[in-house]
Structure formats: structure tokens, C-alpha cells
Amino acid sequence: MKLLPLKVGVYIASFLIVFSCEEIPVTDVSGKANTERESPCLSEAANCTDTLKIDRGSINYYSSFDLDSSHDIRGVIVTVHGAARNGDDYFERMISVVQELGLQEEIAVIAPSFITLYEKQNELDWYWNTTSWKWGNQSYMSDLGESISSFGVIDEVLLRLSNQNQFPNLSQVLITGHSSGAAFVQTYSSTKENNQYKNLMVRFAVANSQYFLYPDSSRYSNQGVYVPTNCNNYNNWPLGFTDSNPYIDVLGVENAKMFFLSNKVEYFVGQNDTETSDMS
């Protein structure tokens, strides 16, 4: 299992935000100035776990700040785990990156945990199979006959972060992932209209993705652009927009293509990331 290299993580975090040195007081829901802040959770991930209720189900996540409380954080990094579904490791690695930069009081770290049946502990837990979560596919049906796209989980996180009563100083959110998590982030970037959240700049960082989504049927090689022949299903989701999932169908394929091309997405490829047997 590989994690995001520390140097890459530092770079990803450092381009997120340039902070002002001025202390800006938080204004709570009652309108009163409040300069107090909750101390960030910086210990091991097990101590920084919370539950996000979405529709009539829930998903666990790790966070350095409580999403249901008011904070004066300026930025958020949402880090998505790889195939090993080890959100705790990714949370701890990104926390170490933020601490390395001395920004633990200014940047919150959030790491969702997309689980399978094997990790399911509660009847309300949303869960997927080992690959469907990273494609934005629907979870398995709950006992109530409902399901949710894994993309919908990040939607809920962004919706909460866009609440200016709770996060009055928050201006930027970076969504990043490594390997399978990078594949998730790259495909998810096609679902968000630029400036969809008026008070938030949402950016994406894709590090060592397993594969890449293309906006059309063209592909690239050392010889240039070409359209593959005798290669069935090469343009199917998540490699292309053919036979996409219900989330994309509701959004609209043409909208997704437009969003894909308009969003701010940074790509990172590790020179030494050449192992082909490790699918994390």
C-alpha cells in the first residue's frame, strides 16, 4: 500500500491558500463576534472520527474540525483514500502535511471513509463494493430501499462547508486523492460547475491516478491524437462518458463535459510511482 508522498502532500497543501496575517473575528449565528475557536483534532485518526448523516443513512469520516460547529478556518482539504479504503491513514498523512506548514489552525482536513460490506457496522451505514465508490456509483440499497452516489457524499460535505454562518471565513476547498482516490477526484471534478458554491473556490488535485476520464472519444499517444478502433467499451464510464452512472445521467452528460473542461484541476505524477501490482 502506498500513500501520498509527504513532499507531494506539502506542495498540494501549500498552493491551496495564501493567508492574511490579520485575525478576523468569527460571527456566530446570533450575530455576535466570537474570537474563540475549537482546537483542531491532531491526534490519531481514531480520536477524530465523526458521522455524517445523509438522507436516511450515514457515513463515517475523519476531520480535524467538527462540521456542525462554527469555525474561523480559511481553507479545507478533503482527502480521498485509495483502494485499501484506509481513510484514517490519509487523514493522518494530510494532518502531518498541514502541521509541517504550520497551518493546522487555519486549514481543516476531512477524510471520508467509503466502506464495503466487510466494514459495515451499522444498519444505517452507506456502503459500496470495492470499486463502485470510486466511480461515483450508487451504494447498495439500504433496508429502506434507498441508495446514494459516493459523489453525493462529497456534495454533502461541500454543502455544509458553504454555510457562511458556520464558516464565515472559509474561501477555498481543495479536494485531493492518490491512486484510486485520485481517480475518484478526477471524475468528481466533472460534476461541479465552476463557482457553483459562490463563496467557495473549489479546486482539485489528482495525484498518481489509476486511470483518467476523457471528455470525448479521442485518446493521446506519442504519435498524437487518435480514436481507438477494435477496442470495445474504451469510452465507457469512468474512462469516458458513454454508459455513465445515474448521478451523471441526472446531471447531464453535456453539462459534465463542460464542467470537466472548466474546473481547476492540478495533476501530479510521481516519477518513481511505477509499481503495477499495488492497486491502492
Q: What spans do the regions from the language model cover?
A:
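Conserved acidic catalytic loop of the alpha/beta-hydrolase fold
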Residues: 152-170
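A domain-start/cap signature at the N-terminus of enzymes
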Residues: 21-76, 84-100, 104-108, 135-142, ...
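Serine-hydrolase catalytic core
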Residues: 238-280
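Bacterial N-terminal signal peptides
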Residues: 9-18
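Bacterial N-terminal signal peptides that target proteins for export
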Residues: 1-10
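Structural cue for short, hydrophobic secondary-structure segments
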Residues: 77-82, 111, 267-268
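Conserved alpha/beta-hydrolase
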Residues: 104-119
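Cap/lid segment of the alpha/beta-hydrolase catalytic domain
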Residues: 115-148
